[in-house]
Amino acid sequence: MDKMKDHDLLTEAGKMVSRCDRCGACLPVCPLFGVKGVEATGARGKNTIARALADGGIEPTRELLDVVNFCLLCRACVDTCPARVPTDEAMVDVRQHLTDLAGGADRKYRLIGGVLKRPGVVKAAAAALSLLRRSGLNGLFPHGMAPEEYTRTHFLTAFAGPAALGQKAPPSAVTVTNRTKVAYFRGCGMEMMFPEAAAQTRDILRTTTRLVAKKNACCGLPHLAHGLRDGFLSLARKNIRLFEEADVVVSDCASCGATLKHLSSFFAGDPAWRNRAAAFSGKVMDLTEYLAKVGYLPRQRADAVFTYHDPCHLVRGQGITQPPRELLKAAGSFVEMKEADVCCGGAGSFHIDYPDAAGQILEKKRRNIEQTGAAVVVTGCPGCLIQLTKVAKASGGKFKAMHISQVI
């Protein structure tokens, strides 16, 4: 079966966190523990809660759900943990268990999940946000959810170098020809929040191969993170079917890419979908990962200094750090940022649900960006870009925030 029962999810979470020996190595790297300094905000505290819940030592309550929801799922604790306890995965399972016992997901998450399950509604929302930007009313939206997009045209006007680069370098590992079926997975965040960046991604991909057009569904991460597991699995099956004929599936959203690469784990016990899911996950690549494989060079070198923010779902979710940096070094000057891989506080809807904590995390990121002296901070995740756009505005014009597809 591809759907675990509530008890199975809790049992699995208990097994995951049972490896925690409470050493506390996770606490210094947890952004939320750094903000709150409370045991339950860090992985050690959450692991203790999950284990007690699985063992029957504490009762499931709505308050307990609030505690496990207060997690960025950034995986910083997992990377630091000597035992590699997957606290993020355990928290997702515990959330699902507690959500089901509470009678279902919160109404706002059901609403968001319902919107993202319908591509036509997502497209309509994208058009509405575009209209708001043109009218100047986007600033009325809270939490930066209708950001002003700093486009490639703006960028080239301000930072264009004297000459475009030459032809692309020979492929370093994978040969992609006109016969290779490369598909672009356009995430909801890119389509609604940063459509110009999504268009730039398509333009870049067309320079490397003949792009296969596919109208994908949401990756399902918002559903998985908020106790809507059935919706997540339904979307996963739809995307697996849609992309079965593609050779490569490229994502320019770190969150989408990480989710799609791990779909196989959710169907490991389902004979009907196990192999199909594994085949799909195996051909998903991040945009920068793909471009490194085919030897892509930026379209133009800019008179700009870049710095880079590592999305959690790219650096820890996919283990990708160097490809985006190498592309930025080829596109202009590059300077490394302090704590570049620390979460920006976006984490899906976390910055909406917990604006104070997210704001404190983001303020640290702003200071680190400004210390680089860079003119542009670049990232590869629309969720992160929403956050970075906020601090770019707060900086008073000291820097701009852009998706990597817009500068290469």
What is each PLM-predicted segment?
Residues 1-18:
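Generic start-of-chain signal for non-secretory N-termini
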Residues 14-33, 61, 65-85, 341-342:
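Cysteine-centered iron-sulfur cluster-binding motifs in ferredoxin-type domains/subunits
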Residues 25-28, 48, 66, 130, ...:
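Generic structural signal for well-ordered, non-membrane alpha-helices
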Residues 1-6, 33-63, 84-112, 397-405:
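Non-heme iron-sulfur electron-transfer modules
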Residues 25-28, 39-42, 209-213:
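N-terminal glycine-rich anion-binding loops that anchor highly charged ligand groups
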Residues 9-10, 87-408:
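Iron-sulfur cluster-binding electron-transfer modules in prokaryotic oxidoreductases
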